[in-house]
Curated annotation (Swiss-Prot):
One of its GO terms (cellular component) is endoplasmic reticulum. Residues 1-71 are annotated as: Disordered. This is Hsp70-binding protein 1. Ubiquitous. One of its GO terms (biological process) is protein folding. PANTHER family: HSP70-BINDING PROTEIN 1, PROTEIN FOLDING REGULATOR. The gene is HSPBP1. Keywords: Phosphoprotein, Repeat. The keyword Zinc does not apply. It comes from the Eukaryota. It holds the Pfam family Fes1.
Amino acid sequence: MSDEGSRGSRLPLALPPASQGCSSGGGGGGSSAGGSGNSRPPRNLQGLLQMAITAGSEEPDPPPEPMSEERRQWLQEAMSAAFRGQREEVEQMKSCLRVLSQPMPPTAGEAEQAADQQEREGALELLADLCENMDNAADFCQLSGMHLLVGRYLEAGAAGLRWRAAQLIGTCSQNVAAIQEQVLGLGALRKLLRLLDRDACDTVRVKALFAISCLVREQEAGLLQFLRLDGFSVLMRAMQQQVQKLKVKSAFLLQNLLVGHPEHKGTLCSMGMVQQLVALVRTEHSPFHEHVLGALCSLVTDFPQGVRECREPELGLEELLRHRCQLLQQHEEYQEELEFCEKLLQTCFSSPADDSMDR
């Protein structure tokens, strides 16, 4: 599954109570069998079964056929299994949290410590699987699971615990504003940026970046925190590392933030982002350059200051881009990178009225 992929949902743990607006005022006429708009929603499994059986019965044509006893029994068993599955998943999460809530063994032997860590890692992995479902993710947060992750496991001694905690935070947070707000309120972003910037384990850094992305993309409060914590500088340092996956994902996030939040282009230019991106393009060619050039394109689009900085003679960007275009012409797999090069040449070096960019 991709970092920002679609996520499933399921039936609620409890059916909603009947609407107060339908049951109050107007006397007993509102509960007559005549109008489907005034019927009470089911309060239990039997009521939901009855609703499923009678659904569509008010359609005049064709008339409903009576449900066979065999089909009625199958439907009831299927729905019972669905409700039972929901309860079981919540119990699984509670069991995992009991494991994770235990204090770390202070004076255990090496074998005991390894077994304890393996059990905790297994609990985090199971939670990550369960929380792919948005309702489970919400239940996990209601069970105070997020407090445990941020408070203890992002800074755990074992790298296997740190990266699994970061992954779980990202899994729960992606595309769910309420969970994002809770995570941000717990101070997770500062810890995640520290992991991305300083952790000795590459996997921890990659998973921390995933969680950061889930907290700042399409989340204004997260982006503001990211800015206050100098997140763009951390992102640039990540792009300068030797870990290909980290470089690509960092450049992709930068490009995404530039497209979605062009108001921060001035901040990035003042940090020397143009010069640093060009320096990255000058490194040995790799697929990572596509995302760097994409970020550079986003930085100069409709932004004269970015264009002026790209034109600085000491950068030698025009010559670099023309040489790169020649290199990529015969390679179909680099078509997007070639298009970014051509767009940069057009935007920064092909305008007949250069002075107009200074206005």
